[in-house]
Amino acid sequence: MGRKMTARLLPLFGFLFLTAYLRSATADVVYTDYIRLVNSYLENVYSLSPYLHGDVLTRIPVNYLERIVNVRFFHYSTMFDMMLGAFFLALNAYLLGRYCEKKRLPVGVSALLILLVFSLNKWEMLTNGSGWVHFAAFVLFFCHYLSLDALLQKTGDRKAARRLLWLPSLTILFFAGPYCAIYALTAVLAELVIVLRFRRDFRQSALRVIAVLLPFGLYFISRSFSVEERHGATSESIFAVVRSRPLLLPRFFVRSFASTVIGQESAGSLPDFVFTLLGLSVLALYAIAFWRAAKLIEKERSMFPLCLIGSGFLNHMMVTASRWIFLRENYGMSSRYALQYQVGMLGLLLIFFLSVRESGTKRARRLAYGALLLFCLGNVLTTAHEIHMAPYRKENFVAMREVARNYAAESDETLVKTLSYHDAARIRKALRLLESKQLNVFYEKKE
């Protein structure tokens, strides 16, 4: 009964916590990436013309429907987007809780794992509502990994088998966006494990791999038509950078692991070598978890923890490979990547606690609880710091609202600095459009 209540109630309480945080730390105003979105899609929110291009899949098509709902019923509220993100994060926590309940993990451990999902190390994604769809994508990733688990049960699961044939298309073509590469790679590697370790039917696995690779291929083709804006990135080649700064990539990669313990901002003025040592410690935990997973997956008949830790590790690699161009060793510690890294941390902890149940040794128990304590303490500090910062962030959002409302009288420099977008002309264009349609900061309730 306790496990069931934990799996169902804690995600609800977590959602309420995020709701309270968002209301205390943000205000309803377009800024940063919203400027681009307004200019691209809000001239006629019902129009399909922005999607009738080769790069359609990079625009994450589900946003078309969500944007219509937001404009029609909420007057293009960024707060609505933020609440959607919080809701899907809570749904992720619910799926994790159900897995812990099924595996009969201790109630206290299950509760702490669920609470880790609601760490405010993701504050940057939570407060930028345009990222709501990424939280939704991770719900679908979890559904895929849990469907693999259902498939591995002795009786099998025909519904799960059918689901795994259509779920990748829904996920990749409509929700995943740039996250689909790691999802696709994780799904394919999982099928390889299923064939080699579980001796399952190769033909069925091949069909599921094709079901992943076909939509991913379409996304890859679509992405080739897109043009990305990367302000602040170097134009040097990676070879030139490695020659001039040989430690940049290793430090970038290692320190990204430190951010799963403590957020960069909450760490304050800690010297960089502390981040490096912390990152190496987390990497060591990853190595132990992968080693234990090799022995564990057959006994548990479960791919879920392995998929989580595998995708988390691959996300660290992807962020390093795609963001080194900003030439900052701590760039990978940004809160905007916390959602991608978080799955690895959860998979690691699940493997450790499932190992405790299997082996029952003191060493396994100490390792599991030690790792849990490390992640919990770090994330408590990060969350406490972010709660402390909430009123200051609120002040910043209120200032953005005032500048946005009075954009006509503001200088270009003020608009660029306050609304965190590089092009003052595009900012003015977006705000004129919102003003003409009485949306967002220009919406006034009728008495």
Predicted regions and their residues:
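Membrane-interface alpha helices of multi-pass inner-membrane proteins
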Residues: 160-188
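Membrane-embedded glycan-lipid processing machinery
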Residues: 28, 80-84, 122-133, 333-337
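Specific aromatic-rich, kink-prone transmembrane helix
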Residues: 133-156, 165, 188, 344-347
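Transmembrane-helix signature of polytopic, membrane-embedded enzymes
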Residues: 100-120, 138-139
